[in-house]
Regions:
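Terminal presequence/propeptide segments associated with secretion/organelle targeting
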Residues: 1-370
Length: 370
């Protein structure tokens, strides 16, 4: 399943784009991913004359495959536990209020320092990053190889790939043909390279073999991929915060924005194509927030968390461990104290940063300048 020295299953499971999962399914660099993961790329290639979103797209030969500037496929070469290294470096920080222990910029600086500039220069396309797990209790360094020449091979029409649309999204069972196909290209040595007609299909270390036999009850099954993050360790106060602030703001603001988008999309086929990916991305998180709040209330999840906390307090008293209830009190106070700030932050993000597209221009300029 995992080996840093030899080809393993993890070499066939890739990060597609900014956060999706893909699977290498051929020795010629073919990548299988979701239709919704390839949706923005399909949209960028769509026009009124060639509406690939509506009609689908299939490259009949490799020279017909479509390049996608900005799209990447990332392979994980290895994962190292660097907890001791990070903790040693953190001890050098004298500011007691420092948040560096969770800072991506700081942690990635440590990653580059650990491997050295020569390693990165000798391995083109390789990047390293350190991620904090469990709120900074564990740290892992990921050594990644990132390919930027990724071409669209095929996608079904949205009537298949997006069947059920927003009505069926986040609902199960699903009946969607949610897939698209891309191909990763590399230089002649198999290294990452910018798009070039001279690039060749990447031969991955490992690719998945597809079975048409199907499965039966009690067959072994597993999932590998890049799911993002979990908030399963939220306290009851954080659960309420997610429901009453985070999700509430997202639902209210996105509902207004999506109504405006849809009105214009229905008027003009060109606008429909141009806004298809933005609308889909917005409605995806919108419906997730609605479903999350429904589940929190339906399952009485806040009370379930309260019960867990009460059991922890009872255990800590029995074991003479006062640090645990003290930590809970601290967390409760922090969540209560930040309510107004958190509401303002979510309103700023949803209503201004995401809601008014022109507001992104100064942000993008600032990013480029940095």
């Amino acid at each position: 399943m995992y080996s840093a020295e030899a080809p393993s299953l993890k070499d066939a499971v890739v990060r597609f784009g900014g956060g999706c999962t893909g699977e290498m399914i051929s020795p010629d660099g073919l990548v299988l991913t979701n239709h919704h993961c390839g949706y923005s790329s399909i949209q960028r290639h769509s026009t009124l004359e060639h509406d690939y979103l509506t009609d689908g797209f299939w490259a009949m030969s490799r020279d017909k495959e479509l390049p996608n500037p900005g799209l990447t496929v990332t392979f994980i070469d290895k994962i190292d536990d660097v907890t001791d290294y990070v903790r040693t470096e953190l001890k050098k920080i004298t500011d007691p209020n420092s948040m560096e222990f969770l800072s991506a910029k700081y942690l990635n600086g440590l990653a580059k320092a650990k491997v050295g500039e020569k390693f990165l220069q000798d391995n083109p396309g390789t990047e390293v990053e350190i991620k904090a797990f469990y709120g900074g209790n564990k740290y892992y360094m990921f050594t990644k190889k990132i390919y930027s020449d990724v071409r669209l091979v095929g996608a079904p029409p949205s009537s298949i790939g997006k069947f059920g649309a927003d009505t069926d999204n986040w609902m199960w069972p699903r009946h969607t043909g949610d897939f698209s196909l891309f191909r990763v290209y590399a230089d002649a040595n198999g290294n990452p390279a910018p798009y070039s007609e001279t690039n060749v299909p990447l031969r991955p270390k490992r690719w998945l073999k597809l079975s048409i036999k199907g499965v039966e009850e009690n067959d072994y099954a597993m999932i590998m991929g890049f799911p993002g993050r979990t908030n399963k360790y939220y306290t009851s106060w954080e659960v309420a915060e997610r429901r009453d602030i985070d999700n509430a703001v997202r639902i209210n603001i996105r509902n207004l924005r999506q109504e405006a988008m849809l009105e214009e999309m229905l008027k003009d086929p060109q606008v429909r194509i141009q806004y298809a990916s933005k609308y889909a991305g917005s409605t995806n998180a919108y419906k997730n927030a609605i479903g999350s709040n429904w589940a929190i209330n339906k399952r009485n999840f806040e009370q379930m968390k309260n019960d867990e906390q009460d059991r922890l307090i009872a255990w800590s008293k029995k074991m003479c461990e006062p640090a645990y209830p003290e930590a809970l009190l601290t967390l409760e106070q922090i969540v209560n104290d930040r309510k107004d700030l958190r509401f303002r932050s979510w309103m700023l993000d949803e209503a201004l940063s995401r809601g008014i597209e022109f507001s992104k221009v100064p942000t993008d300029i600032g990013t480029v300048c940095e």
